[in-house]
Design a protein with these regions (language model features):
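N-terminal basic, amphipathic alpha-helical segments
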Residues: 1-127, 136, 145, 188, ...
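Residue-level detector of anion-binding/catalytic polar loops
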Residues: 70, 215, 271, 418-419
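Helix-loop "lid/cap" segments that line or gate small-molecule binding pockets
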Residues: 107, 151, 317, 345-353
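Hydrophobic residues in well-ordered beta-strands that form the structural core
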Residues: 195, 218, 274, 347, ...
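Active-site PLP attachment segment
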Residues: 293-327, 339-342
Length: 469
């Protein structure tokens, strides 16, 4: 009995098709209707049988593979795992160990206490007061038209982007936005995509790329940003970049490379996916405009409020080149029925009112103070160490002395209840040389920064001699 007989998808129901398909397959496996070792149809065949996109089926298979329900090997069929779980894995009872650290220098975390609660509450009230009844129905998969209009104006004004409301797709953050773009590219025949190295490392982002059947190709980064000549040698037809503030090195893509990248995309008929990471927080000068602004027809621009407001917001956007808009909108439509409508309208009100800009100005001051606190603490407790990437964002790169092993420092710091994170986490190879640490300070007050640096200073310098309590 094949899955096409076991599954019924309700296209008019409130549950997204992907969730229905995943749930139906899980239940069929747990109930024994799909037995251990049984072969499942290919993603292409099941998509045809169910009348859904192949990308949706690939995502479902990938999720169930990760949960242990399915097995697959390159060149062979997807099958029900011999030891498929009898029930979904229970949710963890507590936060990961990092939550118990006294000082956690994790990168990518903004000041959670700085979330503008009063302004957001005002924006939500305004959204509820002014929303039209018709806008409470299922809407355009691109997102709320008011937010798309406001975002287009904001991105043109602040990021020098070429943005029209019709070409903006609202999503639930960077992960979904990138997934939409990559699925659209995959459907057009793209099989390999370049990624900055160091960049996303071996984490969830690249695992998701692999599940789509796309090869992630490393492209080296140096002090000028991504190496465009090396990119050209890979032969890929798409690349994902963080040009405004490279994650994690903190460098800005050099002007000559910006133009070389635009020329490469035009000559290769390639697509550049621009992750506008940390662009709001620049300390030494005005932020550089988007790459999309000089090559709009070749660049997909991704942005979110996860760093500017809070990760829990789950709101982002994709500014599509016109030739990709329809495909990306279709992927969004197949993924879900759209992002939360009232939250979208509230964000539009927050931006229109000027409260969002005011919040960003305030947070720039907060992060600038913490940036100075980090540099000062290192100068006092571990003088002579090189710190780079401080011109923007809320993390920096600490270069360890020769002979000091990154992994040893990370492990020993954790014994002292301090979370440190090596550059190896961000390298696709996992390599640990040269030894570097990515030091996040966004969610740490200045006293915690001082305390954390003092606690591990001897580890950083490789000169044992005790540490401050």
């Amino acid at each position: 009995m094949g899955p096409e007989v076991l599954l019924r998808l309700d296209r008019d129901g409130p549950e997204p098709l992907r969730a229905q398909l995943e749930g139906g397959l899980r239940e069929a496996i747990r109930a024994g209707r799909l037995r251990a070792g049984e072969r499942l149809p290919s993603s292409r065949e099941l998509a045809r049988q169910l009348g859904v996109s192949r990308g949706l089926v690939q995502d479902c298979y990938g999720q169930l593979y990760a949960e242990g329900y399915l097995t697959a090997r390159v060149g062979s069929a997807t099958r029900v795992a011999a030891t498929a779980p009898a029930r979904p894995a229970p949710a963890p009872a507590e936060r990961p160990a990092a939550a118990r650290l006294d000082v956690d220098f994790a990168s990518g975390v903004p000041d959670l206490a700085g979330f503008p609660r009063a302004d957001w509450a005002w924006a939500v009230r305004e959204a509820c007061r002014t929303v039209a009844n018709a806008d409470l129905h299922y809407g355009d998969p691109r997102g709320d038209r008011t937010l798309r209009r406001v975002l287009a104006g904001y991105l043109r004004r602040v990021r020098a982007a070429v943005a029209e409301p019709a070409d903006i797709v609202v999503c639930t953050g960077f992960a979904q936005g990138l997934g939409l773009v990559l699925r659209a590219l995959s459907r057009s025949g793209v099989r390999a995509v370049g990624f900055e190295d160091p960049g996303y490392g071996q984490g969830e982002t690249l695992a998701a790329v692999t599940r789509l059947g796309i090869e992630a190709v490393p492209v080296p980064v140096d002090e000028g940003g991504v190496d465009v000549a090396a990119l050209a040698r890979t032969g890929v037809a798409a690349v994902v970049l963080t040009p405004a503030h490279q994650s994690p090195t903190g460098v800005v893509l050099a002007p000559d490379r910006r133009h070389a990248l635009a020329a490469w995309a035009a000559d290769r008929d390639a697509v550049v996916v621009e992750d506008d990471y940390d662009a709001e927080f620049r300390y030494d000068r005005e932020p550089v405009g988007t790459l999309q602004g000089i090559a709009a027809g070749r660049v997909v621009l991704l942005g979110t409020v996860s760093k500017s407001l809070a990760p829990a917001m789950r709101l982002g956007w994709v500014v599509c080149p016109p030739h990709l808009t329809e495909a990306i909108v279709e992927e969004k439509r197949l993924s879900d029925r759209g992002s939360p409508g009232l939250d979208q309208l509230a964000l539009a009100r927050l931006i229109e009112s000027g409260r969002y800009d005011r919040h960003l100005r305030r947070m720039r001051g907060v992060y600038a103070g913490r940036r100075e606190a980090l540099a000062g603490a290192l100068a006092r407790h571990a003088p002579g160490l090189r710190l780079t990437g401080l011109a923007a964002g809320f993390h920096a790169v600490l270069h360890l002395p020769e002979g000091v092993r990154e992994a040893d420092v990370v492990a020993a710091a954790r014994e002292r209840s301090v979370g440190l994170y090596g550059m190896s986490d961000f390298r696709m190879s996992g390599g640990t040389t040269p030894g570097q640490l990515v030091i996040g300070f966004g969610n740490l007050g200045e006293p915690a920064i001082e305390r954390g640096v003092a606690a591990v200073a001897d580890l950083l310098t490789g000169k044992p001699g005790g540490h401050a309590d």
